[in-house]
Amino acid sequence: MTFSVQHAEIHFNRNHIPVSDQFNDVYFSNENGLAETDYVFLQGNQLWERWISHNEANFVIAETGFGTGLNFFAVTQLFREFRQQHENHPLKRLNFISFEKYPLKITALSQAHLAYPQFEDLSAHLQRYWPSLILGCHRIHFGETTLDLWLGNVSENLPQLGDYMNERIDAWFLDGFAPSKNPEMWNDDLYKLMFRFTKPNGSFATFTAASAVRKGLESAGFNVTKRKGFGKKRECLSGLKIQSKSTVLSTPWYLAQPAKMEKQDVAIIGGGIASFCAAISLVKRGAKVTIYCEDDALALNASGNKQGAFYPQLSDDNALTVDFYLHAFSYGRQLLDWAIEQNIEFEHEFCGVALCAYNEKSAVKLTKISQLGLPNEIFQMLSAEQLSEKVGLPLNCEGGWIEQGAWLAPRQFVQNAFSFLEKQGVIIKTSQKITALSQQEKGWELENTQGQKYCHEVVILANGYKITDFVQTEKLPLYPIRGQVSQIPTSENLLKLKSVLCYDGYLTPANQLKTSHCIGASHVRDNVDRHFSEQEQQENQQKLQQNIAQPWTQDVNTSDNLARVGIRCSVRDLAPMVGNVPHFEQQQADYYNLFNLRRRKQPIQSAANFQNIFLIAALGSRGLTSAPLLGETLASIIYGEPLPISEGILHNLSANRAWVKKWLKGSKVE
């Protein structure tokens, strides 16, 4: 398993232009890099003229070679000007997908940005959220423009856009170092993928006029035109996709399918963190959102704890799940920062998270995680002495340290964040238990326990373990897990705890009033009893005292019997679910013979799903970390926009994955 990439090695020439040591080429023109960007890419793709005639809500640009971000800054600024001049135009959002094999170090990035002070606000935001060296897609929001920065080799990352992105890209910035300097990137496989992902009448533009590039693009299917080059360059290329070619889907059983909407009217069933994260991503896209929560207040189930840990679920046995959580952790931090900037009040502390090697099994697991090559700010292995210093209390074991980890107050966060959304027009209906969904001509009818009915175009199920209460979802292999979290008084010793401490359970630092801590949680599968358990209360205390055999743990006292019980939703492989709700009976009919269909290379239909019903499910005990990226992914699917995750991760999160794995083996699904 490889999750990390390498930094670029560069120097600055006498014109203060960054130069790649790997490729011995400049990042942008010595003459006027911004003018070259404008001429080659913005004018070469006729962006302004095409935006004027564009009749969809979003426009997608893809780029090879992010470099310093100059092209991105220029097109973002141009799009801002377009939106200011055309406020009522159908085009509302710009998606910019860029691939970078060797990202700059933050110091080099900030130095390069000094050359373009007119982009100061954009460069400051990019520098703030400049990603760790984690392979794959990193989504960063810049108002109405969204950047998907894919780190790693474009030959590996571009295919990960997957079947979903077929014919969804409007324009290409074919950039990067010159073909003579970087021949590995400029190849026929790249051009074929570009053509596959480009919309009919979509375009490309590039600074080069190299014969091999022109022939490769023409062979892929583009109509290529030579135009005058920038500055001293004689010629450059641009082109269009005039005719489409049929493309065989590689994994039709996992194909994500957008919603069909006219009014952008979305109902979300559920009142916790998953519901909020879906809602905020939808609201940013202009959706009219209504929340249906069966409790008399929001965040009363699994999202209702006073303190919860925020850190990625790392393991040594499922690369795709680890990959998801690494990106979810980064994206989730952006959402928390956004909430703080919006003055949404919630207790929190970015204090780090310690993972204790409390027994032989956990020590082996953490050692294997340390061999994944993750950046130190994500994970590093520390000695018992080093970890004790981070934690603030003595430990008898080594362990992992997650520098960017945190704790926050989930119930306070969710309730206040929903109050913020209510002011943005989100309708919140509490004490509304939805019991049935019925498909109508233009959407779905929701019926509650009193027989009242509500109609919406799109429905999202985000109601935790009760997601299988509906006919449409009853076959999903989900199950409930009861978890009791204990609240304990602090002490002189416990006040020294500086970080979240994880073992076969967890202990948080003191809350902001410095009066109490949370310790938990029990884990009882297939149990939905919400009553207090004295046995589980004692077990929460005993697990800490047994795993961390230090005198200070005797201060932990659960005898006040202060606790709350939440019911989490989980699945056997421990990965969340997001996307379309699959139609089990129809997929069973289409795919029961999938093993033989593939072997014989026979045509295979795209997955049959319930139109306009989606879900976020199986968040388990990591909902604080996973929900923000899941919500953003789901909103992207619903609106048919580029996804912030790879095709591989999407497959690993698909609701029908357990069924498909059996069908692919020729096994029957009951």
From Swiss-Prot:
Gene name for this UniProt entry: mnmC
Positions of the UniProt region annotated as FAD-dependent cmnm(5)s(2)U34 oxidoreductase: 269-670
Name of the featured protein: tRNA 5-methylaminomethyl-2-thiouridine biosynthesis bifunctional protein MnmC
The UniProt record lists the keyword Lyase: no
Region (tRNA (mnm(5)s(2)U34)-methyltransferase): 1-242
Family classification: In the N-terminal section; belongs to the methyltransferase superfamily. tRNA (mnm(5)s(2)U34)-methyltransferase family. In the C-terminal section; belongs to the DAO family.
Localization: Cytoplasm
Keywords: Cytoplasm, FAD, Flavoprotein, Methyltransferase, Multifunctional enzyme, Oxidoreductase, S-adenosyl-L-methionine, Transferase, tRNA processing
Organism of provenance: Haemophilus influenzae (strain 86-028NP)
Keyword Signal: no
